[in-house]
Amino acid sequence: MMRVRHLCLHGSVFSVDVRLLQVDGRWLASADAPDGPSLGLGRLPEEALIEALEPFAGIIDELMESVPDEFYWARAGR
C-alpha cells in the first residue's frame, strides 16, 4: 500500500504544501509552486524534497528547517 505524506513547510513569508511518496525504493516529492507543481525524485526523501523546492531558491534551507521532527533525516548531518 502506498502512503502519500502531506507536509506544509513554512518560511518567514509564506508556506509551501508538499507531498511525499515512496515508490520502488525511491522518493517522489511534489511541491505547490507558483507556476504549477514542481517535482523531485531521490533515493532519500530529503533529496526529493530539495529538488521539488527548486522554484523557491534562496529559502530552501528555511523551508527544510520546518520539516516535522518525525522526518529525522532532515536534521541529520546539519
What are these regions (language model features)?
Residues 1-13, 65-78:
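Negatively charged, low-complexity tracts enriched in Asp/Glu with abundant Ser/Thr
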